[in-house]
Amino acid sequence: MSASTSTSTAASQDACYISLLGLAEYFRTSQPPNIKKCIQCLQALFTFMPPSKVEARTHLQMGQILMAYTKNIDLARQHLEKAWSISEPLPNFDVKFDTASLLAQLHLQTDKNSHQAKAMLRRAVELSQNNVYWHCKLLLQLAQIHASDREYSLASELLAVGAESADEASATYLKVLFLLSRAMILMIERKTNDVLALLNSAGQIIDNNIPNPHQKEYLKVFFLVLQVCYYLALGQVKTVKPSLKQLQMSIQTIMAPNWPSDEAIFGANQLEMFVWLPKEQLYVLVYLVTVSHSMMAGYMDKAQKYTEKALTQIEKLKQQEDKPILSVFKVILLEHIVMCRMVMGNRELAIREIAAARDVCMAAPQRTLLRRHSAQLHCLIGLYSMSTNLFEHAERQFVVCVSETSERDLKLFANLNLAIIYLRTKRDTDLKQILDAVSTENTHTYSSQALMGGFYYVQGLHAFHKNSFHEAKRFLRETLKMANAEDLNRLTSCSLVLLSHVFLSIGNSKESMNMVTPAMQLASKIPDIHVQLWGSAILKDLHRMSKDVQHEKDAYANHVKYSENLIADQRKCVQSAHHELVNWFQGDPPVTSGPPATPVLLMPESSVTSSVPVIASTSAAMQPAGQYGQFY
């Protein structure tokens, strides 16, 4: 065959490839897409015995189409594995990296564990060292899988490598993404000093070395979300306010109508084609951290308002594209709002929303969300059981929560509520054992102001029940000092009302009145029906002692009103189909039917509150996810 004939044949083949690829793309983008004909066009390419690179790329495209548009996962896997085997030995050929990334995703969807996905990505990371874009993208993907498997040290190491690679390539924007992603992992590990150092380093780079104002604003939002979560994890509700305000202003800037699209901001340079979250999801996330702050600060009405807005936004985004991260956001929001409902005495709504959270978890593929949130659901059901006086059920729920979780804050929160159950059921040996264990394990290792304040409160409650009033005052003053320093209003109101009861018990009516008055003012502002119930009983006794008949009648009327509200709500609870969830202790939660939760509300004893008076997020450490850096 002459050279001219050979060249002509090659040109003819190239024309066929281009025609078939063009036709395949035409069928794929038709309305509606004609995927069958698209696949037939790609399949026809193989009959021309194409060169290795064309063959590998076509197998990759077949795999992509099959994964995106069909349920034929096995055939998709075959094409991707063929693409990998052809492309792996070929130098300077990016198809191998795209294929490895997709194959890893497929393994995660179909395999029982992530071993094969990790092995595939490790090999691709090794091969991609001369291609900064793919090296960094694959490092992020591998780090995400390790983080999902709670292998945080490995995830952190990979992100550190990514930051170095980006730095060597002078990709400053990408370097900051790696630094902030690593800070997020270290936050989950509770390495607070390391988190602070990384945030400070990233913050300086954002301020001084990011020339593009739009990228700068995105990085600022990521940075501020982490900073807010950092302070909230420490229970520093007052300290966080300036950062939260700055975050809310930044997100308004990004959501403004004249703000460019994500594609326009990140599409020009390959090393800037990375975003943590698209702006619509960032918007939901800012609502979420605002809900968390409002709840911890004791502003239940605000928390409810922001939850409604966030859930509405989530539903809008789900209609456009149902991304898994939206379900994560929804579950965390529901977990927060459930606790708000219980503080306000709306337990029937709370159990409906627990059922809604269960439904979201059960709908996620391979029960991944249920595995991550099972302990939190047990904790919430424990709180619900406590509030409806089902102490045996509550105890079992908290024990399951403690056994299932590796989150130290959640474990402490559940244990403190167990201590209150043992106190109320007069199980002194169990109470002493759990308080000693909590004290030994947490006194020097816990840095959350809110939870440590809750620990001192429980000790004060214990001392009060032992009639050790001097000891009770000592613990409660410590609680008040911590609560007042950070505007933890619910902890303050609960401590004040208990301190008032202590003074009432020792006959100091003046000090008792000085404590119960601000307690009731705060409880009304929150609103906390349990503190209002307790405080109204104390006020009734104080007015009786001072022979103030009218005020005694008013206090008694308020006490009856709060009691009747709680008793009426209790009746609704026991009649609810979702009440059956109190009997879920293992495996998948039972399916219950009842009216759905809509984002909108018999504890007549007056001597103790229904649960630990610190609103601690029962969610795992805030682990928001992103397009190339999903950690949750």
From Swiss-Prot:
Keyword Cell cycle: yes
Annotated localization: Nucleus, Nucleoplasm
Protein name (database record): MAU2 chromatid cohesion factor homolog
Pfam families: Cohesin_load
UniProt xrefs under InterPro entries: MAU2, TPR-like_helical_dom_sf
Keyword Repeat: yes
A GO cellular-component term linked to this record: SMC loading complex
Highest taxon, organism lineage: Eukaryota
Keywords, alphabetical: Cell cycle, Cell division, Chromosome partition, Mitosis, Nucleus, Repeat, TPR repeat
Subunit structure: Interacts with Nipped-B to form the cohesin loading complex.
BP GO terms, sorted: cell division; chromosome segregation; maintenance of mitotic sister chromatid cohesion
Similarity section: Belongs to the SCC4/mau-2 family.
Main location: nucleus
TPR repeat positions: 453-486, 493-526
Signal peptide: none
Record's function text: Required for association of the cohesin complex with chromatin during interphase. Plays a role in sister chromatid cohesion and normal progression through prometaphase.
